[in-house]
């Protein structure tokens, strides 16, 4: 496994990343963190994804980590820049946590997994307070609360084609996320609950890793069958 840092260059901005390259490549994956996170938080998940043969790119979103831009409504462009870079290695999977899960599910990736995705258009005062106190200090943004303005401007997730989207969430997740994910279960969406997982640790748990890998293997298997038609 080759692991190295790379700056992905795009139109007027650069996306810091860490790339995992397996010896035998069967496609690619882009992995993105949530609000107040960083690419370094997602390295454990990235390694497990790369082990099944996906060249895996973990990035810093604007306003986070080594990214030089402040958080703003162009945040999806960071993920799309990484997807574009990965296209030369085959079909691209998008995997993200929280805000990153929302971005993965609305991105141009061929298949997406949202881990505790922030699908809601609004969150309660208590959730906003916790995010501000626990995660906000890690983010470079023009003003406090910019996250909520960015969230309002992101497009909603289209679940019409459920075969290309999957969701994993925790039984002890953010209340708004639990409620919305439970409602999606009735619409035949691919939704998996991880028992006892919290919003803050779900992307580090072995049960989550196993669920992600299982979903990816199913997707890759179906994709190969489709390619042979």
Predicted regions and their residues:
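N-terminal cap/lid segment of alpha/beta-hydrolase-fold proteins
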Residues: 1-22
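Active-site glycine-rich loops that stabilize anionic/oxyanionic intermediates
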Residues: 26, 34-37
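The conserved beta1-alpha1 loop
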Residues: 30-34, 169-170
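Alpha/beta-hydrolase active-site loop signature
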Residues: 36, 60-65, 119, 198-199
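Conserved alpha/beta-hydrolase
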Residues: 46-66
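Gly/Ala-rich beta-loop-alpha elbow adjacent to hydrolase catalytic centers
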Residues: 95-104
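The alpha/beta-hydrolase serine catalytic core
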Residues: 109-229
């Amino acid at each position: 496994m080759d692991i190295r840092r790379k700056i992905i260059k795009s139109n007027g901005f650069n996306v810091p990343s860490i790339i995992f390259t397996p010896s035998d490549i069967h496609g690619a994956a882009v992995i993105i963190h949530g609000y107040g996170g960083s690419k370094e938080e997602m390295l454990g998940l990235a390694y497990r994804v790369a082990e099944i043969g996906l060249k895996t790119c973990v990035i810093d979103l604007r306003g986070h980590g080594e990214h030089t831009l402040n958080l703003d409504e162009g945040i999806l462009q960071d993920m799309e820049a990484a997807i574009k870079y990965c296209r030369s290695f085959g079909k691209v999977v998008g995997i993200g946590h929280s805000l990153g899960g929302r971005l993965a599910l609305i991105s141009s990736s061929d298949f997406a997994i949202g881990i505790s995705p922030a699908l809601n258009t609004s969150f309660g005062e208590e959730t906003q307070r916790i995010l501000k106190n626990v995660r906000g200090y890690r983010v470079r943004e023009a003003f406090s609360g910019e996250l909520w303005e960015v969230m309002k401007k992101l497009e909603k997730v289209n679940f019409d084609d459920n075969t290309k989207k999957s969701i994993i969430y925790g039984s002890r997740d953010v209340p708004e996320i639990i409620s919305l994910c439970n409602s999606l279960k009735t619409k035949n969406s691919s939704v998996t609950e991880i028992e006892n997982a919290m919003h803050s640790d779900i992307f580090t748990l072995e049960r989550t890793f196993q669920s992600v890998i299982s979903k990816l293997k199913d997707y890759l298997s179906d994709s190969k069958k489709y390619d042979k038609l």
